[in-house]
């Protein structure tokens, strides 16, 4: 089905509906960085937080995974300040991996196009899921967290940033209104906001903060701390 590039199909930033569903390929990959910065509150601040946290867990010959690495922006930042560590970015979208490779600035970064649930991870000291798990099939979510826990070395760190649901309908309504106001403040039109919400139905499946905590605890994590929160977007750190 051919995309029609007009206002009715626009999601903003040169990205258009593709078969009425959000996709990370094509226009989305080419314009991803600009779009995500305008779409997610404190997106770049989250990157800075991860840079700072990486200093506590990465050392010489440490391995770090970025699951759902998209265009590789975060790994370039991490590799710059952790020159003796190794970084592997994993993303199942080949268009994202292609862009990440063209943007790669450091030799200690490598990119792999694969589904994380099919990829055999090595023992590592840091695993990052930056707004990635929310796009996984809910049936696989617990298996994903189990895999992360089992792949970490003792004392290793898992950094998880997610869009989250409100704990009840009242809080969800508040989240929605505050988030839509944020997107309008970033220049998105009402058409684009509604189109994006429709495109994510069945594609993105966020859980509540409590549910994410439960996933982590069932996987084996005990030490869990929230490090960032803005509207319905939160970041936490778990240490094995």
Mark where each language-model region is:
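C-terminal alpha-helical "lid/dimerization" subdomain adjacent to the S-adenosyl-L-methionine
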Residues: 163-218
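Class I SAM-dependent methyltransferase SAM/SAH-binding core
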Residues: 65, 72-118
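A conserved beta-strand element that flanks and buttresses the S-adenosyl-L-methionine
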Residues: 128
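Core SAM-dependent methyltransferase catalytic element
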Residues: 222-240
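Conserved alpha-helix/loop element of class I SAM-dependent methyltransferases that forms part
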Residues: 42-60
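N-terminal, positively charged/glycine-rich alpha-helical extensions of SAM-dependent methyltransferases
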Residues: 1-31
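Conserved beta-strand signature within the Rossmann-like core of class I S-adenosyl-L-methionine
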Residues: 155-163
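A short glycine-rich, Lys/Arg-flanked "PGG" loop and its adjoining helix->strand segment in the class I
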Residues: 142-154
């Amino acid at each position: 089905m051919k995309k029609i590039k007009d206002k009715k199909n626009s999601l903003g930033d040169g990205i258009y509906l593709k078969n009425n569903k959000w996709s990370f390929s094509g226009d989305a990959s080419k314009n991803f960085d600009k779009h995500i910065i305008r779409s997610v509150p404190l997106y770049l601040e989250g990157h800075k937080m991860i840079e700072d946290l990486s200093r506590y867990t990465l050392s010489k010959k440490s391995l770090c995974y970025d699951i759902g690495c998209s265009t590789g922006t975060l790994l370039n930042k991490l590799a710059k300040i952790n020159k003796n560590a190794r970084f592997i970015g994993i993303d199942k979208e080949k268009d994202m991996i292609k862009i990440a490779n063209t943007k790669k600035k450091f030799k200690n970064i490598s990119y792999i196009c694969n589904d994380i649930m099919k990829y055999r991870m090595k023992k590592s000291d840091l695993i990052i899921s930056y707004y990635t798990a929310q796009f996984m099939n809910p049936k696989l979510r617990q298996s994903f967290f189990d895999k992360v826990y089992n792949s970490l070395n003792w004392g290793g760190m898992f950094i998880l940033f997610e869009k989250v649901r409100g704990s009840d309908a009242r809080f969800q309504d508040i989240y929605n209104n505050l988030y839509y106001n944020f997107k309008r403040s970033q220049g998105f039109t009402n058409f684009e906001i509604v189109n994006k919400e429709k495109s994510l139905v069945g594609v993105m499946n966020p859980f509540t903060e409590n549910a994410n905590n439960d996933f982590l605890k069932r996987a084996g994590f005990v030490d869990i701390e929230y490090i960032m929160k803005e509207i319905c977007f939160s970041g936490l750190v778990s240490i094995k």
